[in-house]
């Protein structure tokens, strides 16, 4: 991993878990919020139906350029649509009902993204949120730091949401 922020990469085991979830779900439409290098998008895309599509949103142009190159090297590149910009602006413009949504972007935006995609989730759809333990920091008696506080608020928000069932898995 020659990226300055390589610690943010999804690991091999996490990639296999995403691939497994996608494969058993057989989604037609997947939304990924936060692409980074594109690894998790490629893992998720492996389970798409033959006519399925994965739409992934990346805010940072430099990372989007890396993703585009990585996607082009994959046999799945025709199924993956990369959108560059702010997810809050892009999500409403995508006219799909999502079978899987993978949230792995700015931690302070998780609740916003969750609320944006939930009404457009298919009946048996899945929302997968990465980093919900935030390096164990949300388990501290006093949660501190902008991102840890945001993830803790997201966890509490989802746990209190009667519209969904929740499962927390620790995968790295």
Predicted regions: what they are:
Residues 11-172:
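S-adenosylmethionine/decaboxylated-SAM
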Residues 1-9:
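Rossmann-like AdoMet
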